[in-house]
UniProtKB/Swiss-Prot annotation:
GO MF annotation terms: actin binding; Arp2/3 complex binding; calcium ion binding
Coiled-coil residues: 706-783, 1050-1103
Composition-biased stretches (Polar residues): 1-10, 20-33, 1027-1053, 1124-1168, 1201-1222, 1257-1266
Low complexity bias (residue ranges): 1103-1118
Residue intervals of the EH domain: 206-295, 569-657
Family: Belongs to the PAN1 family.
Biased composition (Pro residues): 1299-1320, 1365-1374
Domain of life, source organism: Eukaryota
Biased composition (Acidic residues): 1186-1197
Name used for this protein in its record: Actin cytoskeleton-regulatory complex protein PAN1
Membrane topology: Peripheral membrane protein
Region of interest (Disordered), residue spans: 1-33, 52-114, 668-737, 971-1374
Role, per record: Component of the PAN1 actin cytoskeleton-regulatory complex required for the internalization of endosomes during actin-coupled endocytosis. The complex links the site of endocytosis to the cell membrane-associated actin cytoskeleton. Mediates uptake of external molecules and vacuolar degradation of plasma membrane proteins. Plays a role in the proper organization of the cell membrane-associated actin cytoskeleton and promotes its destabilization.
Gene (name only): PAN1
Length: 1374
């Protein structure tokens, strides 16, 4: 067995065969006992070198000096190990040789050999070989160890040291020189995690320098550089503060006031560019922006994914440690969490043994495997191999008895390994039973046995100094000297895991590959997933059943830590939220989803995250919900699964508060309901003093809540009653208000009646004013009328003139403003009245100017920020100047108006004959219309026009014409008729006056238009004359209808259109009067029949017809010829169009008489008709002798119109029947019966007297006006030679409309005309015609009757056979 071991060692490492037992036992320990050095078995010098190199770890203050980095390479130490099998790779040397250190002799190798991760594979061989010696050799060793234990060793470190106080033990670094290294001397924050991302806009060397500089100035625990620290560096560049400020604006992309590494690198890059002569860009290019932003995103992801280190004692168990925490053997080991023993080395590396490739054994907690002979370093198993002892594991013993707890704390100096080292227990509770404590810190040669190939147990072997020997009998089962260590076979066997969990507790099987570097106290990753951290364990106080394999390998193994959002995450997420929320407090779904989408997660994960975040299902996220969503997103990116339901630790606090409030409200409401309904028994309302005490107490205990609830309910009911009472009171007030409003509404609804009364009163007042004005107008007769007229015209034109002046001035002002705007297009656009600039306009322009100035600053252009202000001021001044000029012009115009009023007021007083009390203000108000309402102004202007066109021409007329209207008006006022009749009369008069201004009527206008369409412009003068005569209905209007006014009639159509509105109103009033006229029509029809009979009798007198001219015959034939004329209206119209000018030119005398509407008095004097009879008929027609409603008072109307047609009727009475055709040219008597003597024409006297004819004939045109309207053109259709009968028929019907038609052919021709047909034919149709004519006898002509007449006259296409007149040419079809 021993030879096999040696052969194995020689085969492995190639060393010459030797006897390690003798060297190790006799010479090794005996020589080193007085010197307290390790055994010298031919490997003394290397061991001494190793110990000398490790002297720095003896004293407590030197514990961190020899911290070794993780970059050790085991192959670098192998030459030393191959020099001798007995070289103990000591990591904790004794203090007797302080001169030799690892850094002096082998600096690089010692750094590598002292690392926790990469320990030499030969370390455990010493212990393993020592375990193979015979018991007598072990006794010798124990003796030597006991001798060496005289001089105790000092406590020494057995673990790995991450940070040492002496920089000499750190890896050598280049000397700090230059700007960057000057800051690096202050220390670098190597814990800062910066992603390995290459920035393309700087070189790799610059990026490395900037990273070093960044690490030197960054604050501990932060990944950003504050503005103050960054300013201290940037100011050393020597640039101007303005340039540095611009560089900061470009670099601080997040506007956080702090710089991350990519931003800091960008700032340094920009500074270098400026120092090299480049300019600072106004904006970063897109590539640089994208690189910096992606770098920042990577940093944020790393910040979120990185968990804080060493926050809890369990963190070391959760994650594999790259470097171990230093542990002193004199301090309390981590027995409360993991393994009870301290590490006696670093992470164990598999080392070659003399008998086989054994796996490294972990001999401590988090430390490296170290031998337990000198300095607790691992011993090689080749030759005198000492078994490596794991302090803190569970040893396997067949006795299945629990191990006793080994003390590793203070004051346990049973074992010393080179000084006063604390005792380390190598055993703990195990299913194998109690094992005696084994000291690893002294020179006590404990003996441990390890099984060999033949399964023979080996005596325990000491791993430390000279201590009391352990029992070497084979009765004790081999004990593992480490934690979870499998028994190792020291010769020819498969390498066993010396730091693994024993098979007895976990069932781990040995494997052939090397162990991974691991620390004692952390379970190796061979039995469970390395990514799953261990839970906290108590290894020294029992309950070791938690080490059961099911706890680690079972599916129930999971992380127990709660998932929470750290403060760093919250600050980062809140900053992102505030960036996008725009101070609204919430983030809409579109923005939040877009932020989540940038993570690259799939749709299902994002939907699940959104459902978890949007707790209230509002479609938007608040700050805490957004932070929760980002946490879940980053958790998913880091590999964590998305929970189906939020754990309580992730539920936002706001949601918790709301849920608690909801639950409280629900519970309180449910309790209240339950109390109110569950205690509705008799006891709730009964107070029985005889109840027993327990019941009484129960009542006292239970009822207060119900009583309080009842009181609260009563209070609530009282409040409800009060509210109901208030509500009723409010409703009552509302009803009262509504009722009051209804009353007002009813009053308003009755307003139409009141309005009617008011309108009637207003109309009455207007009438009185008009009459008073007429009286005043004729009071002062000393002033010529033409002067009055001129003055009135000027005054009436003043209002219109001033209005036009104001309008023109306003237009000029607006045009100037518009011109000013076009001249300055860049000026501020004014939105105020008249294009003025308001404060809002200035504010908008100022914001635009500010934006423009910023753009100019960015683009390097000049700053013209003051130009908009200057432009706005100049534009405003120009507008104000224009407005002031306009106001000044208006003031001048006002002064002119006041001057005119001051001059015109006394003139008006003189003209009216009143005292000069009219002031200029009153004159402006009542003459010009300043300050009056529109209706009042219109009435004043209408009154003035009436004075101009009515009162003044009346002075020019005869006194007879002037006397009639005032007398009629006075008579009406004297009679005291009711107000309605006065209003109707006044309306009728106003209508007559307005129509009289143009000398036409509405009906005549339409006839004129139809005649113009048919005539092609012939006889324009005669038609207006006829219209004037026919439209005149008062003596005042008859004066206006003189031939001098015939020019005005040409524009009658346009003026009448302006009066349509007033006519419409008057029509409505006249329609009411038509109903009253129906009774009178019947009476008038009877009178007409009687007159027709009288006319037939008069036809029997030939002498009268012969003595009278053709005019008499024509007038007498009109009533008889009306039915006959109906057969030829169209043909006669055609001849009328062509022959009318001829008839006008032929007879000058007859034309004069015909055109003179006031020639009728001469005709009346020459007529043989009974005057008294005619007067009586006239009175009957006028309604003076009948019960009239007042309508008959417009004598002027009936006086003028009837006289036109009646002249034909009297002609029928006084003339012979064979002379009807002659009357076509004599319709001159149609004019109203105004006594204007014009008897120059000899033939005209034949016409009957106008007074007598007018009443009888007036009814005829009124009744037969419809038919007459259709035949109004027939009077002009007769030829020069003849056609008197048909012309007479037309004239009789048309007399009422066109007085100038009286132009007739010579009288001699009339005598030759055959007599008209007998009258009996006319008796039947005449009443119908009279009915229609009566309908049209109203002041306003009815167009329906006109068209009906035309239709009736249209079929008549031939003249009567009895006439003997040659038929006229046929009319064209219309």
């Amino acid at each position: 067995m021993y030879q096999y071991s040696n052969q194995t060692g020689n085969g492995v490492y190639g060393n010459p065969p030797m006897q390690p037992l003798q060297n190790y036992g006799s010479s090794g320990y005996q020589q080193t006992a007085p010197m307290q050095q390790p055994l010298q078995t031919g490997y003394q010098q290397p061991m001494q070198q190793t110990m000398n190199q490790n002297q720095g770890m003896q004293l407590p203050q030197q514990q961190y000096q020899q911290q070794q980095p993780l970059q050790q390479q085991p192959m670098q130490q192998q030459p030393m190990q191959q020099q001798s099998f007995q070289q103990p790779q000591l990591q904790q040397p004794l203090q007797q040789q302080p001169t030799q250190t690892g850094m002096q002799q082998q600096p690089l190798q010692q750094q590598l050999t002292q690392s926790g991760m990469l320990q030499q594979p030969l370390q455990p061989q010493m212990q393993q070989s020592s375990q193979t010696i015979q018991p007598n050799q072990l006794n010798v060793q124990n003796t030597v160890q006991s001798q060496q234990s005289v001089q105790p060793l000092l406590p020494q470190q057995t673990g790995f040291y991450r940070q040492g106080n002496q920089p000499v033990l750190e890896p050598l670094k280049p000397t700090a020189t230059g700007f960057v290294n000057s800051f690096a001397n202050n220390g670098l924050d190597n814990n800062l995690k910066i992603p390995a991302i290459r920035l393309s806009f700087i070189t790799a060397q610059d990026q490395a320098k900037f990273e070093t500089l960044f690490r030197s100035i960054v604050t501990k625990g932060s990944n950003t550089v504050s503005g103050e620290n960054c300013r201290a560096i940037l100011m050393k560049s020597g640039l101007q503060p303005s340039q540095l400020a611009r560089i900061w604006q470009l670099s601080d992309t997040n506007r956080a006031g702090e710089l991350l590494f990519p931003e800091f690198a960008l700032a340094m890059h920009l500074i270098n560019n400026v120092l090299q002569g480049d300019s600072i860009p106004y904006e970063l290019d897109s590539k640089t922006k994208n690189e910096v932003s992606s770098f920042i995103d990577a940093i944020n992801l790393s910040v979120v994914s990185t968990e804080s280190d060493f926050k809890t004692p369990f963190d070391d168990l959760f994650k594999p440690q790259q470097s171990l925490q230093p542990q002193g053997t004199g301090f309390l080991p981590q027995t409360s969490f993991g393994l009870p023993a301290q590490p006696t080395g670093g992470f164990g590396q598999p080392q070659p043994t003399t008998f086989g490739q054994l796996q490294a054994q972990v001999t401590g907690g988090f430390g490296q495997p170290q031998p337990t002979t000198f300095g607790l370093q691992p011993q090689t198993t080749g030759g005198f191999v000492q078994a490596q002892q794991v302090t803190g594991g569970i040893a396997q013993q067949p006795s299945m008895n629990p191990l006793t707890q080994q003390g590793t704390g203070f004051a346990q100096n049973q074992q010393g390994t080179g000084g006063f080292l604390q005792q380390q227990g190598t055993g703990s509770f195990n299913n194998a039973g109690f094992v005696q404590p084994q000291n690893t810190g002294s020179f006590v040669p404990q003996q441990q046995q390890q099984p060999v190939v033949q399964s023979q147990p080996i005596a325990p072997q000491s791993t430390g100094g000279f201590g009391p020997p352990m029992p070497t009998t084979f009765g004790i089962q081999p004990q593992s000297t480490g934690g979870f260590v499998q028994p190792q076979v020291t010769g020819g066997l498969q390498p066993a895991l010396t730091g693994n969990i024993p098979q007895t507790s976990f069932g781990a099987q040995p494997f052939n590959q090397q162990l991974q570097p691991q620390a004692t106290g952390y379970l190796p990753p061979s039995q469970f997933s390395a990514t799953m951290p261990l839970t906290a364990q108590k290894t020294g106080f029992g309950n070791n059943e938690i080490y059961a394999q099911s706890n680690f390998n079972g599916p129930s193994f999971s992380t127990q830590e709660s998932d929470i959002i750290t403060s760093e995450e919250k600050s980062l997420f809140y900053k992102i939220f505030e960036t996008f929320s725009q101070n609204r407090g919430v983030l809409d779904s579109a923005t939040a989803v877009e932020i989540f989408r940038k993570s690259g997660l799939n749709r299902s994960d994002l939907e699940k995250i959104w459902n978890l975040c949007d707790i209230n299902n509002t479609g938007q996220l608040n700050k805490q919900e957004f932070a929760l969503g980002m946490h879940l997103v980053y958790g998913r990116l880091n590999g964590r699964s998305i929970p189906d339901r939020l754990p309580p630790s992730l539920i936002p606090s706001s949601t918790k508060i709301l849920d608690n409030v909801k639950n409280q409200l629900i519970s309180s409401s449910s309790d209240g309901n339950r109390k109110s309904f569950t205690r509705m028994d008799a006891l709730s309302y009964k107070n029985d003093d005889n109840d027993k005490l327990p019941n009484f107490r129960n009542r006292r205990k239970n009822y207060p809540t119900d009583n309080d609830a009842d009181k609260e309910r009563q209070r609530r009911q009282e409040r409800e009653r009060e509210e109901a009472a208030k509500k009723k009171e409010q409703e009552r007030k509302t009803k009262m208000d509504i009722e009051r409003a209804r009353k007002q509404g009813s009053f308003t609804n009755s307003e139409p009646e009141f309005t009617d009364v008011s309108v009637s009163e207003i109309e009455d007042i207007k009438r009185r004013i008009t009459e008073a004005q007429q009286k005043l107008a004729v009071r002062n007769q000393s002033i010529p009328n033409d002067l009055k007229k001129r003055f009135n015209e000027v005054v009436a034109r003043l209002p219109t003139l001033f209005v036009e002046i104001y309008k023109v001035d306003t237009e000029i002002m607006q045009a100037r403003i518009e011109l000013c705007k076009r001249r300055t297009p860049s000026s501020i656009i004014g939105t105020g009245p008249g294009g003025s600039i308001t404060e809002d306009d200035r504010r908008k322009a100022k914001s635009k100017a500010l934006l423009r100035s910023r753009m100019n600053a960015l683009t390097g252009k000049g700053d013209n920020s003051d130009e908009p202000d200057i432009e706005s001021e100049s534009f405003t001044k120009e507008i104000e100047k224009i407005q002031s000029e306009s106001a000044q012009n208006k003031k001048i115009i006002k002064d002119i108006r006041i001057s005119i009023s001051e001059l015109s007021a006394p003139i008006r007083s003189i003209m009216t004959g009143s005292l000069p009390t009219c002031s200029s203000t009153d004159f402006e108000k009542w003459e010009i219309g300043v300050g009056l309402e529109n209706d009042v102004r219109e009435f004043v202007l209408t009154l003035k026009k009436g004075l101009l066109y009515v009162s003044e021409p009346s002075h020019m007329n005869s006194n007879q014409t002037l006397s009639h209207p005032p007398a009629a008006a006075l008579k009406k006022e004297a009679t005291g008729e009711d107000r309605a009749a006065q209003l109707k009369e006044q309306a009728q008069k106003r209508m007559k006056e307005r129509l009289a201004k143009f000398g036409i009527s509405r009906r005549e206008t339409r006839d004129l238009e139809s005649s113009k369409q048919q005539e092609s412009g012939s006889t324009p003068d005669a038609v207006p004359a006829a219209q004037t005569a026919n439209a005149s209905q008062t003596p005042f209007e008859e004066v206006i209808s003189s031939p001098q006014k015939m020019e005005v009639t040409s524009t009658a159509g346009e003026d009448n259109e302006e009066e349509d509105e007033e006519e419409r109103k008057l029509k409505e009033q006249l329609e009411l009067l038509k109903q009253k006229k129906n009774a009178e029509k019947e009476k008038r029809l009877a009178d007409l029949r009687r007159q027709i009979e009288e006319a037939e009798k008069e036809e029997e007198h030939p002498s009268v017809a012969q003595s009278n001219s053709g005019n008499v015959q024509s007038s007498s034939n009109q009533p008889a010829s009306v039915p006959v004329a109906n057969s030829q209206p169209q043909n006669l119209q055609n001849t009328h169009i062509t022959t009318k000018p001829l008839s006008l030119n032929q007879t000058g005398s007859s034309y004069d008489m015909a055109s003179n509407t006031y020639f009728k008095p001469t005709q009346t004097s020459q007529s043989a008709f009974d005057r008294e009879k005619a007067e009586q008929q006239r009175k009957i027609q006028r309604g003076l002798e009948s019960d009239d409603d007042g309508w008959s008072d417009d004598d002027d109307d009936l006086y003028s119109k009837p006289n036109t047609a009646p002249q034909t009727a009297p002609v029928l009475d006084s003339s012979n029947t064979p002379q009807p055709g002659m009357n076509a040219s004599v319709p001159a008597p149609i004019a109203p019966p105004i006594p204007t003597p014009q008897a120059s024409s000899p033939a005209v006297p034949v016409a009957p007297p106008i007074p007598a004819v007018t009443p009888s004939e007036s009814s005829i045109p009124m009744t037969s006006n419809a038919d007459v309207a259709g035949a109004d053109h027939l009077d002009q259709d007769t030829d020069i030679s003849g056609a008197a009968a048909s012309a007479d028929k037309q004239n009789t019907s048309h007399v009422s409309h066109i007085p100038p038609v009286p132009v007739a052919p010579p009288l001699p021709q009339v005598s030759s005309i055959a007599p008209p047909p007998p009258l009996p034919n006319l008796s039947v149709p005449q009443p119908h015609e009279t009915v229609d004519n009566d309908d049209g006898s109203d002041v306003l002509s009815i167009p329906d009757s006109v068209e009906s007449d035309k239709e009736d006259l249209a079929p008549a296409g031939h003249t009567p056979a009895a006439m003997g007149i040659p038929p006229p040419p046929p009319l064209p079809n219309f």
